Amino acid sequence: MEPAFPASSAGVQSQSGPEPGAGQQEPPPPATPLRPVASQSRFQVDLVTEGGGGGDGQKGQTAAQPAAAAKDKDRGDGGAAAPSPASPAAAAEPPAAAAEEAKGRFRVNFVDPASDEPPLSSQQQPPPPSSASSAHGGHQPPSESMNGYPQNGDTMMSEGSLHSSGTGAHHYYDTHTNTYYLRTFGHNTIDAVPRIDHYRHTVAQLGEKLIRPSLAELHDELDKEPFEDGYVNGEESSPAEEAVSKHVADNKGVVKFGWIKGVLVRCMLNIWGVMLFIRLSWIVGHAGIGLALLVIGTATVVTTITGLSTSAITTNGFVRGGGAYYLISRSLGPEFGGAIGLIFAFANAVAVAMYVVGFAETVRDLLVEHNALMIDEMSDIRIIGSVTIVVLFGISVAGMEWEAKAQIVLLGILLLAIVNFTVGTFIPANDKRAKGFFNYRGEIFSENFVPDFRDGEDFFSVFAIFFPAATGILAGANISGDLADPQLAIPKGTLLAILITTIVYAGAAVSVGSCIVREATGNLTDAIIPGTVTNCTNVACKLGFNFSSCATNKCSYGLMNDFQVMSLVSGFGPLITAGIFSATLSSALASLVSAPKIFQALCKDNIYPGLHVFSVGYGKNNEPLRGYVLTFFIGLGFILIAELNVIAPIISNFFLASYALINFSVFHASLAKSPGWRPAFRFYNMWISLIGAILCCGVMFVINWWAALLTNVIVLALYIYVTYKKPDVNWGSSTQALTYLNALQHAIRLTGVEDHVKNFRPQCLLMTGAPTSRPALLHLVHAFTKNVGLVVCGHVHTGPRRQALKEISTDQAKYQRWLIKNKMKAFYAPVYAEDLREGTQFLLQAVGLGRMRPNTLVFGFKKDWRQALMKDVENYINAIHDAFDYQYGVVVIRLKEGFNISHLQAQEELCTSQEKSAHPKDIVVNLEHSDADSSKPSSKSVSETNSPAVCQDQKDEEDDGKASTQPLLKKEVKDPSVPLNMTDQKLLQASSQFQKKQGKGTIDVWWLFDDGGLTLLIPYLLTTKKKWKDCKIRVFIGGKINRIDHDRRTMATLLSKFRIDFSDITVLGDMNTKPSKDNITAFEEMIEPFRLHEDDKEQEASEKMKEEEPWRITDNELEIYRMKTYRQIRLNELLRENSGTANLIVMSLPVARKGAVSSALYMAWIETLSKDLPPILLVRGNHQSVLTFYS
């Protein structure tokens, strides 16, 4: 029998040779079976070979299955066991029928990588019920007959493998002769059922990435060669898969937080800052209870909208570390993300200093109160702040787990302080009445409900003071990488934190406004003796105290004057001080942790290349120790300044800029209508998010207008920098989605616009083949289409279909990336066809979208047409005819040295491979190439000889489409002992000549025939470009000798109406003069090999030859077009005489009548017309006007 496919994945050696007999003992399985890596759950396909002519009824077997096992496994009755040779059923089944049944079948074996146990052999595997029953000849109970198998056919899937029974064994399924496994969907095909592991990134945090079968594996013909290593397409443990395994292993033991400890606690601690204890009472005093609640409510509206937007973004896919930077960058792209990420990380680093200085100031006030200053007030702040940040730095470096424990302790202290304040409002305040505290009083509430702004304060200034307290809502999101489930934790924790803290702020505002009067002296002597008549009318007088002296003298107590009102009201004053310490330290600790995490994520993305050193993480939690050190020194520096009144508003604006962009991200993503924008969190609205973004921007200017302007300038500067650097990332941002949507909408809108001559643009289908192989052709066409018209680089792939289609799939991204990297505003369009003509026809008909379709076909001249196969020449000329048929304009460009440098690229690649080889051999490359044939790569003949290598010593580069011609175009020959030959040197220089500034020269336009104006429009467009602007246009036209002046004036008038500048007009009156004999002779010698010479042959022979070789030139044809031939020869003489020194020649392309002029004669005309000249464009429009003098 034929050798079958090896199946190393099963751990069974492949077998070939004669089939063993029925009684032959089965070889034992190897002790250590081969298995795929942990990151694979793959499959293999075994061909079932045709059975031999034996009489035992066996239908053949796979190599992975021993013969004895095959007899038990291969059964044709759908479920019964295969009969043994001795059974009647075996004799009853005809061998021919068995062999016929086996034809065309293949067996799908699935490999479970999750199990460490060796596979069961065929004898060890428990059979299905029908098999067991039949084999043992009797009925067994269901529990026994199903021994080793799941009870239901749909329970075969396990977490480790799609096709594992969960018992640790690998099962091999014959899905065509065994219908048992058809009960479980997905077990009878290599097609994969839907599974989450197929959608993971290469290195996923929640599991391993599995690779589904490719479309080619399902659709292509089955290869006759065995799969390498037993895996489909020879799949092995790739570097990416090894990285997955390593990443999963490294993640063991990582500390992850839930929504309470990770988000809720952090957000509440950051929002409950010192504002709650030392500024809220002052706000109520000025704004009154009513406006104070409005201030809190307005801030809550902004933070709630931002929280909703944050929730929408975080539930639209898996969230990694980086907080606000990650959310914005993955939504709006690297430009906004890079700008915000840097300032947001810096803002958090400086916020550490702000909170620590707030703590130090509180400690300093205690020292002043007890007369215990160390040096002076400012120096004490620096000393206390420095010691504090060192302690906080030690906690953060110790790890997130220790930091989280410290936050829990601080939250406990803070909650005790809030409870202490609440209880204190109910304790009778007999000894505190002189300081303005009277417990809950309706009169005090009524008086304090209305505002009483003083000292130039107003609603907006009070709001500006309060709002920074609400900027802690992203404290949980900032450590998104350390959350167990960010998609659940961030929305739940953030929104709940906003709700709780808002209730506490509002409750505290109402409490202090209901208990304490605005001003109090603190003197018990101001108590009103009952029966005494006073002139005061405020609520304090009604409560027994006359504080009217505060109207003229500065008082120290009351809502307006005392920042320590919370301590006054509380049941135990020192606990409020501890609460202030807790609020400042917890906020400082949260910022100290957030800043390095955000900065690390920013550096990992390599948005700013110089900062990549800070992306390194340490330990199981990937702690950014370098970022901690940087944040420590930034915070320490601002602590030593000890004056944060100037920097504080800028920091608040940095936070608000981040919130504005988060809101805008949701609006932008919703506006783009990307199918990928589908957040699991549904309670958001794109217009509310837009309002939130506008509110954030408004609040920025309310807090401090100059700080808002400075923030916007910094963000804009960073945005421009990142845009200019163009980081090589692709995150599927909403910016890309909206760009697509706008392009789609505008393309559709454009289809309803009728063409107009004033809006004509040359839109070129440029037959470059691989764009890297003809750079000069691409640069020249790009010069007159850049920012004006469309360029599509057509590439016709020929040869074996399967190979060509694979090349197309890889070349599409490769060459489009090369065009972008080389700043070519062009598209790449590959197509598969039998030959160049067919491929060009496909492109002419199909390329483009709506009005964005090519209207001009551009070819490079086929320089080697006389040596090439005439079939290729016929295809080349017919492609030009096809373009005219499709109403395209045609441009044929000729460069004396040629365009095709693919043989130099091939030579470079061979040199590179030679340098990499352990035993380098001398290689000689013999190449024959064409400048026009873009249907296939140049033919190569590679031979190993002892001659010196003809290659340059150049640096090896990966063949990824990134400027692969740049080494050839920019590097000089470094090794003089192996130079390029003279022809290749000239070709190499010519390939880059259109990349240089052309300098002062001329563009000679030979506008011999009116084609609609394309021959004149192209040179005009060239002169508008920077590299060609110093060139002057000279126009040459045909005319009569006796009307030269008249023809010149007529043309000058026409050009002036077209608004086209020119330096000179030349009228050629001797165009129809007979060319020189030498040139005529040269032409005749050139076409001699292509002539039919029918007069020298019998009529039947000549007709047969003409039918077989239609490209040949007949004597009759040559005679009919003799004058046209002479014209081409004469024009070449005039061109060399008048335009031999021009920078560029643009000339009307002669048109050959289809079916009348042979391909060889037409090529000879073009060859004769354009030889021995500077770069020349032979142009023929489609005879529709492209110029107009009407407005």
Curated annotation (Swiss-Prot):
Binding of chloride 1, residues: 273-275, 468-469
Phosphothreonine, modified sites: 175, 179, 184, 189, 202, 1114
Sequence positions that bind Na(+): 269, 272, 583, 586-587
Descriptive protein name: Solute carrier family 12 member 2
Catalytic activity entry: K(+)(out) + 2 chloride(out) + Na(+)(out) = K(+)(in) + 2 chloride(in) + Na(+)(in)
Positions on the Cytoplasmic side per record topology: 1-258, 309-339, 402-404, 477-491, 597-624, 665-687, 719-1191
Annotated transmembrane regions: 259-288, 289-308, 340-367, 378-401, 405-426, 459-476, 492-513, 572-596, 625-645, 646-664, 688-705, 706-718
Biased composition (Polar residues): 142-155
Entry keyword Lipoprotein: no
Organism (species): Squalus acanthias (Spiny dogfish)
GO CC annotation: apical plasma membrane; basolateral plasma membrane; cell periphery
Regulation: Activated following phosphorylation by OXSR1/OSR1 and STK39/SPAK. Inhibited by bumetanide.
Location in the cell: Basolateral cell membrane
Binding-site residues for chloride 2, renumbered to this chain: 344, 472-473, 655, 659
Pfam families named in the record: AA_permease (PF00324), AA_permease_N (PF08403), SLC12 (PF03522)
Disulfide bridge positions per record: 536-541, 550-555
Residues that, per the record, bind K(+): 270-271, 355, 468-469, 471
InterPro entries the UniProt entry points to: AA-permease/SLC12A_dom (IPR004841), AA_permease_N (IPR013612), NKCC1 (IPR002444), SLC12_C (IPR018491), SLC12A1/SLC12A2 (IPR002443), SLC12A_fam (IPR004842)
